[in-house]
Amino acid sequence: MNARTPSSMLLPVKTVKRKKETSPVTPPPVAVAPVLIEDEDLNNYMQLAGMGKLRLDQLMYKCDALQAEKRVIESAHLYRQWIEHTEDPQKYLALFNYGSVLQTLGMTDLAEEAYRLCVASEPKLAQAHINLGLVLERKGQNQQALDQWSNVVAQGVVNPSSDKLMEITALNHIGRVYENQKQYEMAEQALRRSLQMDPKQSGVIQHWVHIRQKACMWPVYQSLPNVSANDMLMSTSPLAMLSLHDDPVIQLLSAHAFVGRTYGFKEEFLSKDKHYKHKRIRLGYLSGDLCTHAVGLLMADFLEAHDKSKFEIYAFDYSPEDGTPYRARLKQAFEHFHPVGSLTDREVAELVLANEIDVLIDMHGLSSGARPGICAMHPAPLQGTYLGFIGTTAMPWLDFVVADRQVLPEELTPYFTEKPLYLDGSFLPLNKNMADITPITRAQVGLPEDAFVMAAFGNVYKINEDLLAAWANILKQAPQAVLWLMDDNEKTTAELKRKLNQIGVAAHQVQFSPRTSYQEYLARLQVADVFLDSYPYNCGSTTHDVLNCNLPMVTLSGKTMVSRMGRSMLSALGLHELIANTFSEYVDITLKIANDAEYQKELVKSVKSSMLRKQKNPKLLTASLEKQVQLLIHKNA
């Protein structure tokens, strides 16, 4: 899950107005396909432009009017006609606006050409460099895009009296692209500079904080000029907050602040007073992760287990078509499968309403790819969230959260805006059908054959100072142990190595391996001796994989839903001895396994037998959800 890119980090494509004259330019023409114009007034403008007799201000006025009427292509033709036949000292302004129109139409090659002519004519027009960079980024030319934005930041390009916003925007784009490239140090520097210029950018603070997490820059919260501690806290994304604070109050406040500034709390009630009386309950799933995504990988058995005699199962899906057999299997699990990726939120909501869905389950919550605008219209009488975001969403249009009493005990419910819908056992589905695994040896991944291997393959941003200190404590007391981590990117790996060395961990006790295919990742789990869960953001789908590989997992359970996922699964399997409540217990449990080979073997047997018992009836969890849905409908009838 990745944090959502806020609108404050993006510069909208826009046109510019005429300003003081500069030297004339005569660029070569940039053309789009011809179009038949059946508008006498527009034809008059085209004729004047073709004769070089249309003033620039008249051109801009008419083109703005055409765009307001959604006649964008005709606007592009008028700009082209004027550019080809008119000499004007401010032709670069028309070129910029022409590029903007072409960019809106998705004609990236032509837009690039127009913008390049523009900046060649007026190198200090910051907006042109910004938009040219966006076009180049869209074409996959990231370094060239960065060069354009760097031009804006460079001294002498920006007009200080009017273009401070342009410099901030350029820095934000630079930070965004570097973040996407996992060049976190460069991204952090760009966004830091942006915040020094304007400290009130909550969306930029959000990204800056999460970048520091992903780069293991500790402390994550570092003081910035004119950014208060509270502003920094409340600007942190809910996803980042899950791994920063094991405090349900802070997580609720963070989610509420994020929803307020990103989506707002405006609701519609399309399904108001709707009480359907279908023979079978119509249960809908709204998701963009019905594929080989972490959430999707949990769902196949669960969805296939629905009782079709009592439930009619719908998908409203905007997942990527990855072409895998698993994706095909997920699609087959639904009685009605509606691809909605090309539809607007309103169109999806109206489709849900038209299908008279009784209960709609949003599989995203506040996770990456969420489309909360759909549920905000209340297209179904009852709506809830499941799996995508392990915490409260603070979205008033979601009535319930699917959970269990271990992961969300009643004492935590005051910190949720949703009511808990409790399932029996663990709320995490257990998909028994694993991918085909080709066994590997330790030598193939650079591990010592005789070492006690402790795998910790959670996302790097889930690592924090306290967790790293606990791992170091284990390594110091178990010299035969090796900590096996994921090599997410070169700089973060180097930083983790430096930190471990600084607290006295020998270099040979730490092994990093790069990301790999899902099949190889499962094979790696099978050559480890134990898995160390992260805290306070416990592993979710990874826990499922670990236990399916019969690998014991030590978890640290906390005070929030996300820090109790490991407890949820291990409790359901009867493996209570692997659940720690403090860092001290976490260390002690792991050391006991590391120093007692017989105990380790018994644990492996316990995990295997517990998983086999659980897998004998994969329909239990689905049946539990169905029972709760039936009770919910009856209660709200």
Predicted features, each with a name:
Residues 302-309, 465-479:
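Short hydrophobic signal-anchor/transmembrane segments that target glycosyltransferases
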Residues 317-322, 482-495:
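Glycosyltransferase donor-sugar binding loop
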Residues 278-282, 448-454, 481-482:
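Charged active-site motifs of nucleotide-sugar-dependent glycosyltransferases
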Residues 364, 533-539, 557:
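Short Ser/Thr-rich beta->loop micro-motif in glycosyltransferases that lines
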Residues 1-446, 459, 501-503, 517-527, ...:
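Alpha-helical solenoid repeat scaffolds of the TPR/TPR-like class and their adjacent stem/linker regions
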Residues 532, 546:
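Donor-sugar nucleotide-binding helix/loop cap in glycosyltransferases
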Residues 339-341, 508-517, 535:
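Active-site donor-binding acidic/aromatic loop of nucleotide-activated sugar
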Residues 552-561:
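Short hydrophobic beta-strand element within catalytic cores of glycosyltransferases
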